[in-house]
Design a protein with these regions (language model features):
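Short, Lys/Arg-enriched N-terminal segments with co-localized hydrophobic residues
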Residues: 8-23
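Helix-start/capping segments and mature chain N-termini
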Residues: 20-99, 112-251
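Hydrophobic alpha-helical interaction segments
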Residues: 102-107, 160
Length: 252
């Protein structure tokens, strides 16, 4: 990755216009309501704990919604609660995207362990410039099964730490010295001319894009030692919003 540059990524520029927020419509428990009358904030987060999905939309149509719903059901089950049916969710999402339109958007669905759920649809702009990565030095447990859950502040704190250090994303390592993922992304790395991604068992969230590149692009699943990061030939950050963002450098 040497010499590939270190252009920063601005991320997804969510519309933060206050006048828009005051009249913003969201879904709360299947009903279209004003944001001020809902249980979520303007980014779709609710108080308490639960699971969530962040989904890319194109022309107001959510991408890979069924896959996201299956993951949400699985995540909720691991935490001991259930969520609304896919039929109910699809109907509510269609209504929301018809009212809060965006050529490209971010759909966030939050499912609380108390039975409440919410959805917001926000416009965003994707920045595909190559990202500079750093290795986060505080390891995570390799024993705990990752679940896409909130509060999400611990992951966002890692991302903010990376940005405050002059990087765009942080690589998380487990307590066995294995590479896991980015703070808010999965990793796709090229080593010895082969594309690989770390296994779920190493402490990796089961990303939708990660699953797709494994299924359709011949990507291998293999544990990666942190020392191997020095030998990476090429890399991408994977997420449902970024799709596949190229990496400019690692600890450069």
């Amino acid at each position: 990755l040497a010499g590939m540059g270190r252009d920063g990524i601005k991320g997804f520029q969510v519309n933060k216009d206050c006048s828009r927020t005051t009249r913003m419509k969201v879904i709360q428990n299947g009903l279209l309501v004003d944001l001020v009358d809902s249980r979520c904030n303007d980014k779709g987060w609710m108080d308490g704990a639960g699971v969530f999905e962040t989904i890319r939309t194109v022309n107001n149509a959510p991408w890979a919604l069924s896959r996201h719903m299956r993951r949400a059901v699985s995540s909720a089950k691991q935490l001991g609660f259930s969520i609304a049916s896919e039929e109910v969710l699809r109907s509510a999402v269609a209504l929301l995207c018809e009212v809060e339109k965006a050529p490209m958007g971010m759909l966030r669905l939050s499912f609380g362990d108390d039975g409440n759920w919410a959805a917001v649809h926000l416009p965003y702009e994707a920045n595909t410039q190559p990202a500079a990565l750093m290795t986060f030095q505080k390891p995570i447990s390799a024993v705990v099964q990752p679940v896409k859950s909130y509060p999400y502040s611990h992951r966002l704190d890692i991302l903010n730490f990376a940005k405050n250090s002059g990087f765009d994303e942080a690589i998380i390592v487990n307590d066995l010295g294995k590479v896991c993922e980015g703070s808010v992304t999965n990793l796709l790395l090229k080593l010895d001319d082969k594309w690989i991604t770390p296994p779920i068992s190493d402490g990796v969230l089961p990303g939708i894009m990660r699953a797709l590149v494994i299924e359709y692009c011949g990507v291998s699943v293999k544990s990666i030692d942190v020392a191997d990061l020095q030998r990476v030939q090429s890399a991408f950050l994977l997420s449902s919003l970024r799709i596949a963002q190229p990496v400019a450098s690692i600890d450069g």
